[in-house]
């Protein structure tokens, strides 16, 4: 299996956001605890810079909250389907995300 470079993951996140008119705010890596979020009403996500595959799939999950199915349902349904969207659109995945 070909290893996906960090830059390719970062570019993929940016391309998805651009294609879906999503603005991105980045949480500094100096902040110890990640604070990811998505705001559908303003099409904006907060993510950490794409430092590794875990950060990448988390970014895709937040994008999934904007463009994924069933984001007007219960919190559990929204979370599940944001992960489904992330998995379906990822160029690489991490076993810990399963």
Per-range role (PLM):
Residues 49, 70-73:
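A short glycine/serine-rich beta->alpha loop
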Residues 75-98:
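Post-HExxH zinc-binding segment in Zn-dependent metallohydrolases
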Residues 3-6, 14-54, 66:
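Active-site scaffold of zinc-dependent metalloenzymes
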Residues 1-8, 86:
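A short, highly charged nucleic-acid-interacting micro-segment common to nuclease
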Residues 57-70:
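Active-site recognition of the HExxH zinc-binding catalytic motif
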């Amino acid at each position: 299996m070909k290893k996906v470079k960090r830059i390719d993951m970062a570019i993929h996140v940016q391309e998805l956001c651009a294609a879906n008119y999503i603005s991105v705010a980045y949480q500094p890596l100096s902040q110890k605890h990640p604070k990811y979020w998505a705001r559908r009403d303003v099409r904006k996500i907060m993510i950490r810079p794409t430092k590794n595959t875990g950060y990448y799939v988390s970014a895709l999950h937040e994008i999934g909250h904007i463009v994924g199915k069933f984001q007007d349902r219960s919190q559990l349904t929204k979370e599940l389907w944001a992960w489904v969207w992330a998995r379906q659109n990822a160029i690489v995945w991490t076993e810990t995300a399963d």
